[in-house]
């Protein structure tokens, strides 16, 4: 599985990463190094709000023209906001790359944020918030991060708060984008059958009016982690439970070991230890999963399950039993080999999703200015020892390090 990439930095500071392939479908877009954690206290929800408004009008296009520009050639225009980045991108037949790069440059750098569009979009996002709050199996993930990062932007809901959203004006969105939507604070990525020299030429042309303007913003680091246990009473037909702690940041060498342990415990395979214990053997849950998120300076490890109210304690005991097994005894040679083989296969299969691969490339290059070759990832996994996994287990899964959030 070969991975090739080309990298170039424009005079205005915009970095370009290009991953060529022979597919008829290409992906390209801008990734901005700004997300929910970069909002001021009075801007909660602004990163996501701006992402919505990028499609609502520029100096030369109305919203309808933006929506139809790629649709007319069968393409797709999309965006998402995360805690640490915002990505605006398009999927299209490779021959339409010039159209895509011109449109994306226009909406990312020249959006005007008309007030009448803001007033309409506020109601759309509030409806999104209400829909989200009706889904406890999703909402609990945000509430758990708030438990892990109290009084810190990483603990905030990406969607924001209705009372603040109603206060947002055009100048607020313009102020936010002028602070973060700068060429040196983002990257342009493209994956597909598009010539690299052509990519550089067209991106440079579309961003020729931009200049580098290095800011002084520094992200606030989280305070020292103190485990918390919280039970909230909600009117739901089943209980929802989160167990976990802060994890390793994306630079930490131990992250690969935790990644493998996370997969052993509650990865997507039906043979994960938690799925076998709680669902297959006990019939206590429909869904149980373990998740790992790495930020630039911290991370989150968590286990989620939903069960009948009367079965919460039993499920908790089974989860802690599986965690204790990993702490008490290193994996055998056979267990370690099987775990490595499974996760390497899963990564290989996941790379068959071109859109996911393009977005993953963008996120990695944005934050770390490099791109991992899959073979390098596989080598790091293969190099892991049982002793390393055992040490990480005892560091991460010790009961006195775990936080718990329960919806009853």
Indicate residue ranges for each PLM-predicted region.
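Short beta-strand-initiation
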Residues: 3, 11, 225-227, 273
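Active/ligand-binding-proximal structured segments within catalytic/core domains
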Residues: 13, 20-70, 253-265, 273-278
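His/Glu-based metal-binding/catalytic segments typifying zinc-dependent metallopeptidases
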Residues: 20-24, 29-31, 214-271
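Charge-rich, well-structured scaffold segments of protease-associated domains
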Residues: 2, 9, 66-215, 221, ...
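Histidine-centered active-site/metal-ligand motif
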Residues: 48, 52, 152, 240
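Short, well-ordered turn and helix-capping elements at secondary-structure junctions
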Residues: 14, 32-36, 74, 245-247, ...
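Short, conserved beta-strand segments within well-ordered enzyme catalytic domains
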Residues: 17, 27-31, 54, 78-80, ...
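Non-catalytic terminal extensions that flank enzyme cores
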Residues: 1-15, 25
């Amino acid at each position: 599985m070969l991975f090739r990439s080309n990298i170039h930095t424009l005079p205005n500071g915009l970095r370009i990463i290009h991953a060529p392939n022979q597919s008829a479908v290409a992906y390209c877009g801008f990734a901005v190094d700004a997300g929910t954690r970069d909002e001021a206290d009075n801007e909660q929800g602004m990163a996501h709000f701006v992402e919505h408004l990028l499609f609502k009008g520029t100096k030369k296009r109305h919203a309808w023209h933006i929506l139809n520009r790629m649709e007319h050639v069968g393409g797709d225009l999309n965006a998402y906001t995360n805690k640490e980045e915002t990505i605006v991108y398009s999927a299209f037949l490779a021959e339409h790359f010039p159209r895509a790069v011109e449109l994306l440059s226009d909406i990312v750098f020249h959006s005007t944020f008309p007030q009448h569009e803001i007033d309409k979009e506020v109601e759309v996002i509030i409806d999104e918030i209400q829909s989200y709050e009706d889904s406890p199996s999703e909402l609990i993930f945000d509430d758990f991060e708030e438990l892990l990062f109290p009084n810190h932007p990483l603990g905030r809901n990406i969607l924001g708060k209705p009372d603040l959203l109603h206060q947002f004006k055009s100048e607020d969105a313009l102020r936010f984008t002028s602070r973060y939507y700068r060429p040196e604070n983002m990257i342009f990525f493209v994956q597909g059958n598009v010539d690299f020299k052509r990519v550089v030429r067209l991106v440079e042309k579309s961003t020729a009016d931009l200049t580098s303007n290095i800011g002084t913003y520094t992200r606030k680091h989280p305070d020292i982690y103190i485990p918390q246990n919280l039970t909230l009473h909600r009117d739901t037909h089943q209980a929802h439970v989160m167990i976990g702690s802060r994890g390793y940041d994306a630079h930490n060498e131990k992250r690969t070991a935790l990644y493998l342990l996370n997969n052993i415990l509650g990865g997507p395979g039906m043979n994960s230890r938690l799925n076998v214990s709680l669902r297959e053997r006990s019939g206590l849950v429909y869904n149980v999963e373990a998740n790992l998120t790495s930020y630039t300076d911290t991370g989150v490890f968590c286990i989620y399950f939903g069960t009948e109210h009367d079965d919460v304690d039993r499920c908790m005991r089974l989860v802690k039993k599986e965690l204790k097994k990993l702490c008490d005894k290193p994996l055998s040679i056979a267990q370690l080999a099987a775990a490595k083989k499974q996760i390497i296969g899963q990564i290989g299969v996941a790379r068959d999703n071109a859109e996911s691969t393009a977005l993953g490339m963008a996120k990695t290059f944005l934050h770390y200015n490099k791109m991992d070759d899959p073979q390098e990832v596989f080598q790091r996994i293969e190099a892991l020892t049982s002793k390393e996994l055992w040490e990480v287990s005892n560091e991460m899964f010790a009961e006195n390090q775990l936080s718990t959030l329960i919806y009853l």
